Amino acid sequence: MKGILLNGYGESLDLLEYKTDLPVPKPIKSQVLIKIHSTSINPLDNVMRKGYASSIVDLKLKLPIILGRECSGEIVEIGDSVWDYEIGDQVWSASPPFSMGSHCEYITVDESEISLKPKNLTHQQSASIPFASLTAWNAIYNVLPTNKKITTNTKILVNGGNGSVGFFILQLLKKHLNVNQVSTTCNIKHFEKLKKLTLVNETIDYNNLKINDNDNNKFDLIFNCYDGGKNQNENEKKCIDALKDGGNLIGFNGPLVKFSDKDGVLSGLPMGMMNQLNSSERIKKQYSKNVHLDYAIFSPSGSTLKQISKLYENNILIPNIDKQFNLNQIKDAYTCFENSNSNGKIIINNKF
């Protein structure tokens, strides 16, 4: 099969190699083999190719590896223990970060990680959704404390609403949960698009997130989709300043991987876990403010994808695509991704 091998970690796109003679994987037990029509590039793919999470990836996989976390395609073979799907089913999937990915023509995934794709979406549209939607779903429904669940009157800010996760969160909040007051920060050029889609009540330039000292103007909950990168600490402070005392902050770039990459898995993971468990206490000491900080992560789930599929089929949610490339244009696709400033997902298509 055709596929893209990552031969080493680093900035250079020359570390990505287009191959035409890779073996087609064989599904075992509860796995299915998907003929991939379309896949995508996620922010995680872009940082993983540069070495992010390599300390953990190396425990399960050895270079070269295949990146890509989501796909849409057709089941062409099933394992002996698969009962809920059959050959010919049109499905979508998002697989764990530490497994071989979808930047190729065929992939094996467990049947628990797939569902039938939305009937009203193309494979290209469907491939833009699973990874970000499952991350966002986890943040909204599984991370918040039970006494802080979102209501229609919760005042919410999505910091980074033009990114793939942020865009999905905005849609869920306004179109599914009917939250009355939703604000977002993003690049100025995305203001009109988000307003036209009626996904926000207020748009804020992400370079100018300033809330006055009146607690009534502050937010009950902030989803911090900008919590990575070199300005992470400054960004965290802006979010905390914008929260009411007793508010909730949900990030997406927890300390587990950072500590593991820095200090190795054996010492880094325990340190990262302690740091994450003590995040709220750290904020209280550092900023003299009572804010509850949690981190949301991607978690593969076919049952959740099934729920999300219904939201698309009922026209409650819409896909968001920027540009499309063929698999052999992978270097151009990554270049576009790094320069796109989140106009939508970058899609990679296979031609059979």
Swiss-Prot record:
Gene3D superfamilies: Medium-chain alcohol dehydrogenases, catalytic domain, NAD(P)-binding Rossmann-like Domain. It is an enzyme of class 1 (oxidoreductase). Residues 11-348 form the Enoyl reductase (ER) domain. It comes from the Eukaryota. Keywords: Mitochondrion, NADP, Nucleotide-binding, Oxidoreductase, Transit peptide, Ubiquinone biosynthesis. It catalyses: a quinone + NADH + H(+) = a quinol + NAD(+); a quinone + NADPH + H(+) = a quinol + NADP(+). Its main location: mitochondrion. InterPro entries: ADH-like_N, GroES-like_sf, Lipid_raft_assoc_Zn_ADH, NAD(P)-bd_dom_sf, PKS_ER, RTN4I1. Belongs to the zinc-containing alcohol dehydrogenase family. Quinone oxidoreductase subfamily. It comes from Dictyostelium discoideum. Pathway: Cofactor biosynthesis; ubiquinone biosynthesis. The keyword Mitochondrion applies. Transmembrane segments: none annotated. SMART domains: PKS_ER (SM00829). NADPH binds at residues 165, 206, 296, 298. It is found in: Mitochondrion matrix. GO terms for molecular function: oxidoreductase activity. The keyword Cell wall biogenesis/degradation does not apply. GO terms for cellular component: mitochondrial matrix. CDD domains: RTN4I1. This is NAD(P)H oxidoreductase RTN4IP1, mitochondrial. Its EC number is 1.6.5.2. Pfam families: ADH_N, ADH_zinc_N_2. NAD(P)H oxidoreductase involved in the ubiquinone biosynthetic pathway. Required for the O-methyltransferase activity of coq3.
